[in-house]
């Protein structure tokens, strides 16, 4: 039902972007409201709140892009940052900004959230957030790009706005994860690519 709501929302957004007839535009606005109500039934969030969130986008509806950067040290520990929003831990990352290439987006996020200067050396995976079962359900379709990155040795204080803490963790001693951003399987796949860079990029 969530996928139906997302598809209805995308159709409404496209219609509001390219439609010209006043009656059609009104129907597309009604369709957008129905999509918000349907997603509300799935997620438990208020339909009014979802309608505002869905109405922020304009133009042809496309998936949003989330980038995540995995950095490992010689002891196979992974660099994680503690999210201010939920107090849990994640690979550094976030929404890609317009004007950023995927690799520059992920290295910018790593710098802002951990203080580490780095370079992206490999695309680990392009995953569909829903297929990967990253909770909670969102009212938009999301592609998640995971990169293997390498620090260049330069470190500065991270941006306090988003980050509570930064740390290195062994895979058998991971802290509570912010599962909407990264799950255990995704970290395991990132480590596999760190250990064997010849592995092919994964995708859904």
Predicted regions and their residues:
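Nudix hydrolase/Nudix homology domain
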Residues: 1-30, 34, 88, 156, ...
